[in-house]
């Protein structure tokens, strides 16, 4: 529970590395330059993206150059600028930190919660946003499979109808944001990276979430969700839930229009101006493809695992 038509695609994973390197080179992407400094710093190997809290600061580079040695990411940087990182929670420590955050934020709202499994499941990926190794946000992506989705427990009729229409379903669950941080940038970045996993990399086209009825309007207004199922009791968290659905094509259109344009936030009252720009998204997708193991995607056909990648 949650509190543009491009060039030809590369469906062969063996060709993707060459394809993606050309794409990244075209965007001049190699390093994440710290704001207000001429110095740049490499991302750590398990970091998907490092993001300034200030939404007006542009991202200069997103991809780790594997040939460079590790170094202090704050060396030579303006330490008055805050940076958070988004990682896939692959270690027991990262997953424990995410579980603690989920439990703390859910308990504050009177929800039940269960800890994340010790290891990443083949059909689920948990992302963690952290500042100085402190978890400040987390979200879990669930991919449809013969085992089904969590939303099937309450909304089997609705999900069955979508599958019958040929929709490729995924779900976002276990969203938790540290109430002290209260950053639209962190929330938008987590959602955008989760979208990249589900849509750009995996080829899923429909996102399902279960939310408290009080939060329905927020997700409709801020991300473009529509109500798909009535209010029912979610026994996993012991709270009422409404099923919402987002067509990823709508999200893609909004990202193309508003992504990377925080100056539109007052006019376009949604989260999309706080998303990454289209070139930044392409670079992050490239990093995901190069750093995440194929085993995560082994339950899908090759054509779906690599859907959405551009190759010139």
Where do the PLM segments sit?
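Generic structural signal for individual residues within well-ordered alpha-helical segments
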Residues: 96-99, 217, 252
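Conserved N-terminal entry element of GNAT/NAT acetyltransferase domains
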Residues: 42-92
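Extreme N-terminal leader/anchor segments
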Residues: 2-56
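Charge-rich, low-complexity intrinsically disordered segments
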Residues: 239-311
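A conserved beta-strand-loop-helix scaffold within acyl/acetyltransferase catalytic domains
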Residues: 78-167, 177-179, 200-201, 222, ...
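Hydrophobic transmembrane alpha-helix bundles
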Residues: 15-19, 26-39, 146-159, 207-211, ...
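Short charge-dense sequence patches
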Residues: 35, 39-57, 137-150, 165-173, ...
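Acyl-donor binding region in acyl/amide transferases
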Residues: 152-250
